[in-house]
Amino acid sequence: MNTFGDNFRVTTWGESHGKALGAVIDGCPANLPISEQDIQNELNRRRPGYSIFSTPRKEEDKVEILSGIFEGKTTGTPISGLVFNKGQKSKDYSKIKDTPRPGHADLNYFLKYGNYDYRGGGRSSGRTTIGNVIGGAVAKKLIEFTHNIKIIGYSTKIGKIKGDFDYYKNPKFFESDSNIEKLLKKIENNPLRCPSKNSDEMKDYVIDAMDKKDSVGGIIEIIIKGIPQGVGNPVFNKLEGKLGSAFIGINAVKGFEIGRGFEASELYGSEMNDAYHIYENSIKEMTNNAGGIIGGISTGSPVVLRVSIKPTPSISKIQDSMNLISNKDEKIEIGGRHDPIIVPRVIPVLESMAAITVADLMISSGYINPCRI
């Protein structure tokens, strides 16, 4: 439905062209230092207008916290935050309200519910991820404050152009906090949030698609660094199962893999297995091909995840569809303001869902006191 999590729960609400969107976070312990600006900083990363490759829709996305935070700290009660929509242009959709847009949820929503908000996709719009990011901002703060866990997201592939930077090209890079700080700055200073040296080639690829009135997708890598051993459970409450559920809940996501992922099918067992050794009186893995999770439980190594993002379905090209009133085939030309690539703006959303998942399981696994910090 609209709530994710068991102990740390985030409920999102709102539609693309409604009055407002937001989230209610229940289960955050008291005494967590956090400000409205902390949440705003994360929303700014998701906000439209981030780069030349994002929608020209103008939105301030200013968050208002209504409850749950007092004198700069959480109170342990539900945290409620909202963002008012200000830049919606619903008239852009009035001409196509009876013609389902290919690649969107319009037709499925109509067939299932009968009555749905067609403006900008309503509840199925990417804009509804504002609620995810509000919840994720709180979760990020919680896991970093209590266990210094950091979540780093970046694009590794745009369309058919593969980047030259990812975790497995240099795993030791992520052992250094200074390296990570430099990486984060590099990511945020790139319009595609891509740290690869060939990111200019990726930019040209997107521009070419824009010139053709088309769109492109890509692959995002998410690294969770600092998560302790023992987070997650066997069988139906696995860490990777929860992360997969969190990510697949985002409409743009079409694929998900952990560690070596599908590449593991090509390896010998001797190549895939992460051997152990004793280092400074602790058991350490010599490699991290499993991606930080074995048996549904975190190993203590960085969790390595990759997510496939589909091309933005709203494109300016004329497409085939049908009319729900006349029940006849019809051409559709989508107006409005849309992202030629959604990948860079999905990154903070994926980071948010990863943080919510980790916070939830760390509370259930006993790593975080559910009452107070």
Curated annotation (Swiss-Prot):
Its EC number is 4.2.3.5. GO terms for molecular function: chorismate synthase activity; FMN binding. This reaction introduces a second double bond into the aromatic ring system. It comes from the Archaea. It comes from Methanococcus maripaludis (strain C7 / ATCC BAA-1331). Its cofactor is FMNH2. This is Chorismate synthase. It catalyses: 5-O-(1-carboxyvinyl)-3-phosphoshikimate = chorismate + phosphate.
